[in-house]
Amino acid sequence: MRTPQLALLQVFLLMFPDGVRPQPSSSPSGAVPTSLDLQPGTVGGTLQSSSEATATRPAMPGISTVVPTLVTPSAPGNRTVDLFPVLPICVCDLTPGACDINCCCDRDCYLLHPRTVFSFCLPGSVRSSSWVCVDNSLIFRSNSPFPSRVFMDSNGIRQFCVHVNNSKLNYFQKLQKVNATNFQDLAAEFGGESFTSTFQTQSPPSFYRAGDPILTYFPKWSVISLLRQPAGVGAAGLCAESNPAGFLESKSTTCTRFFKNLASSCTLDSALNAASYYNFTVLKVPRGMTDPQNMEFQVPVTLTSQANAPLLAGNTCQNVVSQVTYEIETNGTFGIQKVSVSLGQTNLTVEPGASLQQHFILHFRAFQQSTAASITSPRSGNPGYIVGKPLLALTGDVSYSMTLLRSQGNGSCSVNRHEVQFGVNAISGCKLRLKKADCSYLQQEIYQTLHGRPRPQHVAIFGNADPAQKGGWTRILNRHCNISAIICTSCCLIPVSLEIQVLWAYVGLLSNPQAHVSGVRFLYQCQSVRDSQQVTEVSLTTIVNFVDITQKPEPPRGQPKMDWKLPFDFFFPFRVAFSRGVSSQKCSVSPVLILCLLLLGVLNLETT
C-alpha cells in the first residue's frame, strides 16, 4: 500500500512545485515588495494542511487587499503546469513566431516561469489575482487553504499575504449584438463628440423664418443652393461670394472685384454674366428641398430689365453686371410668391489691374401689394426720423433716399451712391473724368454729379411723409457760387464741393420726442478754370452736416402759495408803550391808559 501513496505524493509535488507560488505586483503600501518564501514549520506564516485542526487568529485591524496580480502560465510542450491555466487570449503577442519581451503569455517564448526571465509581465499577459495582507507579527500559524507569502514593504515591515481566488477578475465581458436597428442608439449612448458633424435626419421646416437663408434650385444640374448676396470684406472691400441672403432682410451691399486678366475673365467669370443671376428657381418654402423638382415649390426668377451676355470687343469688355436688384414678394408662412430681378450693366476697359464695383440690393415686400404703394420708399420713422435711417427726398411726386458721392476702386465717381443717413455726418469724394467741352456743359454735368439724378427739390419733415401731401415736405434752399466775384472774363466757374446742411429738432413729449427736419440747404463751393485749359479730371467732395436746434422748454412749475403775513413791526408802537407801562409799574400811569380814558370821557360828553 505504500507504493501507490508515494506515487500520489510525487504527482502532488509535481503539480505544486516550490517556485510557482503567486508573485504580487505590488505590496500593500503600493511599492514593489521583497518576497520571502515561508518554509514549512516557521512561525508566523507557515502554510498548514487542511487536515490540521489548528485555527488562525481572528481577523485583526489593518487588514489590506493588494491590487490583483498576474500569474505566469506554463510553457507549451512542458507537461508541468503553472498555478493558473494559460490565458485564452494573449493581448501582448504581437509578433507571430517570435517571443515578445515581457509578454508572459506568449507561447513562442517557451518559458516555464516567465517571471524568472522577464523583469515584469505586461498588463493582460497573466491572470488577475487578489492578495489580502496583514502585519506578519499578528499571525502565529496559518491554516488557510489559499497560497500565502510574506512580503517586505517599502518601510521594511513584513506583511503576511494570502492569495484569494477572486473569480470575478477573470470574467469575460458579454458582447453586445450590433445591427442596423440599434447601431445609432449604441453610438449615441456610449459615443462622444465626433470630428465631423452628424447628419441631421430631421425634416426641413415648413416655412421660412426671418433671417433664414433662401434656398434656390438649378434644374439643369439638379442642385440645391442658396441665394447669395456678395458683400465686401477687408480694407479693399473684396467680394465675398459666400454671404447668404436672409429672408425678410432688405439690405444692400457693395463690393469690388479685381481682375488679373480681364480679357479671359470677361466671358468666363460667372459674376460678370447676367444669366447667372436669374437662371435658377427659388424654393417657395424650405420643405420644398425634399422634392425640389415639384413645380409647386418652385418660383421662377423674372428678369425685368434688358440684359446682354458679356462680350469682348477689342480692348473693351462689354455688358458686365454692375448692379443686381432682387424684388421678393412674400406671403407670411406661405413663403415666397414672386421673385424679380433687374440688372445694371457697364463696360470695362481691358487693362492690368482692372477693377469693378458691384452693388447688390435685396428688397422684400408683401404679396399682392399695390404697384403705387410699392414705388414709395420705406419709412425712415413713424412719425419722427430714426437715427441711421435714410433722409427722404422728393422730386415731383416721387420720393427716394438722398444720396452722396461714391468712389470706385480706382477713385473715379461711381453711378452707385451712398445714402444720406439721418443724424450721421459724412464726407465723401471722387474724381470725375470729363471730356473737353464748353463751360455750360461742364457746369451741368458736375452739378448733376454732386446732388445726384434727379435733383432733390424737397426733404421730408418726418420719416413717414406721404409724397401726395406736400405739406409734409420742406423745400431745399440752394446757395450757388458768386459769379460776380470772378474778375477773369475768359474763365469758367465750376462747382467742386457740395455741403448739405440739415437743421433738425425734437418735438412732442419729453418722454417720447420725435425728430423732424426744420430746414435743408445746399451750399456749393466753386473754383474757376480758364476756357482754354483742357479739364480732364475734377476732384469733387460732398459733405453732410446735421445740426440739432432743439430748444428744450423750461420744466413746469407749480403756482405760488398765498402766505399772508403782517409786517414785523406792525404793533411796534403799542408793544413799546405796553412794555414801558409794565416796567414803570407804580411810578406812573401808562400814556395809553390815559389816552383811553380821555376818549371815553369825550364819548360820554357827546352822548349827554
Curated annotation (Swiss-Prot):
InterPro entries: Tectonic (IPR040354), Tectonic_dom (IPR011677). Glycans are attached at residues 78, 179, 347. Residues 23-58 are annotated as: Disordered. Pfam families: TCTN_DUF1619. Residues 45-54 have a biased composition (Polar residues). Residues 608 are cytoplasmic. The keyword Signal applies. It comes from the Eukaryota. Part of the tectonic-like complex which is required for tissue-specific ciliogenesis and may regulate ciliary membrane composition. May be involved in apoptosis regulation. Necessary for signal transduction through the sonic hedgehog (Shh) signaling pathway. Belongs to the tectonic family. Part of the tectonic-like complex (also named B9 complex). This is Tectonic-3. It comes from Macaca fascicularis (Crab-eating macaque). The gene is TCTN3.
